[in-house]
């Protein structure tokens, strides 16, 4: 079962008490769908999954499923601090109608590649649900390409990967290794989106699409149409935005950008210093001007 398209990784709005803000979430999802994304992905790094309890995350899953029309796709990240919680999230996601699950590797503690292979195999076989490996080495144990390919070949329910490693060499390696296999290859690093699509990958899950979905949807469409000049132009615009987002902690820049666009997602998770306040103000001023001159 291949999953194709451009998916927005969704931030998790909260109120001033840190509770899931359902009305703002609904507005955010409507904003993303109106911009033309093929679906949404919740529960990933952009959604700040380590901050939320399982019950809170299940509430987000059900809210997302209720907002999506039949022609859009729901993907759900099920990373957590334990196998037990990961399995609970996977069961809830599939019951709610998710098309596939994003399975990040364990966070915080370091493991060997054999441990990661055992983990992914156990979770996917227990859930008996389509799982996309989620390589997120900045925040979890990284998956070696050899481990990824072994899991794709050997595990029935490991159907693909969202590669957020940023390793350009993986783009061609995984595309070449597919060789007729029905694997789903999704770009997870926005800087490599056009490179992945041009190499035959099936789409992308984009954090930047959460705050600028029209740009990412246009870039994906341009790649599909084979318009090399427009693809290059839009990728350059995307890289301009990524360069401005990168100095912020993940995913602060995306949430700050949403606020500048009239979709505030609640307080940031740490106290804000005066220097950070100035940085935020400068970025939001830049963003408003940049948006006025970005033709998609």
Predicted regions located by residue number:
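Catalytic alpha/beta core domains of metabolic enzymes, predominantly
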Residues: 125, 138-246
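Short, amphipathic alpha-helical "lid/cap" segments that border enzyme active or binding sites
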Residues: 22-29, 117, 145, 277-287
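Active-site beta->alpha loop and helix N-cap motifs at the rims of alpha/beta catalytic domains
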Residues: 2-140
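Short, flexible micro-motifs
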Residues: 8, 21, 42, 46-50, ...
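Secondary-structure boundary/capping signal
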Residues: 72-73, 131, 159, 182, ...
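C-terminal alpha-helical cap/extension of soluble enzyme domains
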Residues: 2, 7-11, 31, 35-37, ...
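A general structural signal for well-ordered alpha-helical segments in protein cores
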Residues: 25, 57, 61, 86, ...
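Alpha-helical structural signal in soluble globular domains
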Residues: 35, 59, 63-68, 92, ...
């Amino acid at each position: 079962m291949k999953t194709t398209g451009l998916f927005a990784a969704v931030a998790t709005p909260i109120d001033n008490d840190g509770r899931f803000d359902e009305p703002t979430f609904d507005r955010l999802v409507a904003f993303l769908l109106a911009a033309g994304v093929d679906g949404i992905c919740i529960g990933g790094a952009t959604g700040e999954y380590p901050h939320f309890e399982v019950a809170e995350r299940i509430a987000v899953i059900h809210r997302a499923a209720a907002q999506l029309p039949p022609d859009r796709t729901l993907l759900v990240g099920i990373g957590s601090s334990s196998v037990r919680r990961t399995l609970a999230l996977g069961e809830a996601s599939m019951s709610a109608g998710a098309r596939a699950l994003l399975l990040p590797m364990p966070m915080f503690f370091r493991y060997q590649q054999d441990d990661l292979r055992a983990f992914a195999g156990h979770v996917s076989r227990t859930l008996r649900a389509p799982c996309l490996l989620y390589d997120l080495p900045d925040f979890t144990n990284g998956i070696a390409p050899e481990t990824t390919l072994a899991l794709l070949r050997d595990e029935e329910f490991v159907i693909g990967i969202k590669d957020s490693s940023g390793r350009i060499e993986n783009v061609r390696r995984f595309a070449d290794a597919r060789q007729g296999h029905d694997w789903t290859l999704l770009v997870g690093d926005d800087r490599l989106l056009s490179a992945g699509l041009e190499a035959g990958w099936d789409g992308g899950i984009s954090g930047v699409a959460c705050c600028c979905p029209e740009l990412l949807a246009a870039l994906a469409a341009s790649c599909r149409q084979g318009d090399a000049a427009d693809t290059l132009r839009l990728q350059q615009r995307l890289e301009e935005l990524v360069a401005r987002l990168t100095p912020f902690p993940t995913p602060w820049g995306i949430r700050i950008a949403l606020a500048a666009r009239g979709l505030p997602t609640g307080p940031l998770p740490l106290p804000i210093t005066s220097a950070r306040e100035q940085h935020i103000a400068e970025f939001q001023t830049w963003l408003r001007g940049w948006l006025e001159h970005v033709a998609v």
